[in-house]
């Protein structure tokens, strides 16, 4: 899409792309170089600001991947190294390897985070903070669950859940819908949409460091399937940033907290994990358990 825009000025916007282990040669040096070249050609640019490892590659070495990313930084092809969907222990290992081998370190992590899934708070975010790495939240509306469109576990409506069945076990769970009822009720009482409440929670009440004095530079990945959705999401973010009125009423905050407790303590599946698999050279990888909800998604 970006490649079709006329006169795209590379330094006028921040460009990011990813390398995925499912592509030919995965996250091997050859695979990473092939994928960055494909992205550059598609966008018709010579460099990108951010280049992410989308998720661990269980067939290739993390160290080899990091060495290749360091070379791309030195060559000027990329500016910033990012990671996504890695376990906290492997993220820490990435920093340790970079320090040991004198490599450019990851400075941004893109991860699953929203009011219905806060798994990164206790485990991942401390690792990022200790290593000066920012966090960008994806799925801020739980893939659309927090829009209020999906309010019955038995009805799969049009959208991401209909078009991507492996998303169903991530969010379409009895615990999530029980939690949604609490949030919906509190939002209706406060006359706030769930979309706006979710963005206000993320930007004003969550563990993210948005515009913090410490410069942590966290962010939220705002998605949309239409221009109308994008405009509404941006308006909600704008209202969240309002110094006087951006914070949520206490009853809505209480509902978000109670909702997360329901999901966190669900014995059937629990919250979907923020990480996927592990690299081939990850020590102790056998002890990492992704849990029932991830296994259910893989079975689809």
Label the predicted regions:
Residues 120-160, 185, 192-193:
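Aromatic-lined glycan-binding groove of carbohydrate-active enzymes
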Residues 21, 87, 112-117, 139-146, ...:
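Glycine-rich beta-alpha junction loops
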Residues 2, 15, 39, 48, ...:
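Conserved, mostly hydrophobic/aromatic
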Residues 9-11, 75-76, 131, 190:
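Helix C-cap/helix->beta junction micro-motif
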Residues 8, 12-30:
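Structural motif corresponding to the early beta-alpha repeats
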């Amino acid at each position: 899409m970006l490649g079709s825009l006329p006169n795209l000025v590379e330094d006028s916007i921040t460009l990011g792309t990813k390398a995925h282990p499912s592509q030919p040669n995965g996250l091997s040096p050859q695979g990473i170089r092939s994928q960055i070249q494909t992205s550059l050609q598609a966008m018709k640019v010579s460099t990108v600001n951010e280049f992410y490892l989308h998720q661990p590659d269980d067939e290739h070495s993390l160290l080899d991947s990091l060495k290749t990313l360091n070379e791309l930084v030195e060559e000027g092809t990329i500016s910033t190294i990012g990671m996504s969907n890695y376990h906290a222990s492997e993220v820490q290992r990435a920093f340790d390897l970079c320090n040991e081998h004198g490599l450019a370190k990851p400075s941004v992590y893109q991860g699953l985070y929203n009011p219905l899934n806060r798994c990164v708070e206790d485990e991942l975010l401390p690792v990022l903070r200790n290593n000066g790495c920012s966090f960008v939240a994806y799925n801020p509306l739980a893939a659309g669950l927090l829009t209020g469109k999906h309010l019955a576990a038995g009805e799969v409506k049009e959208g991401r859940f209909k078009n991507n069945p492996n998303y169903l076990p991530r969010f379409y769970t009895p615990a999530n819908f029980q939690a949604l009822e609490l949030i919906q009720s509190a939002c209706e009482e406060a006359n706030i949409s769930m979309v706006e409440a979710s963005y206000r929670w993320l930007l004003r009440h969550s563990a993210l460091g948005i515009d913090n004095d410490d410069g942590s530079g966290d962010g939220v990945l705002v998605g949309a399937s239409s221009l109308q959705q994008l405009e509404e999401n941006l308006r909600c973010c704008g209202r969240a940033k309002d110094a006087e009125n951006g914070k949520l009423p206490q009853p809505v905050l209480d509902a978000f907290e109670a909702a997360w407790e329901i999901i966190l303590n669900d014995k059937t599946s629990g919250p979907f994990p923020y990480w996927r698999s592990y690299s081939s050279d990850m020590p102790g990888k056998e002890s990492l358990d992704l849990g029932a909800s991830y296994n259910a998604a893989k079975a689809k």
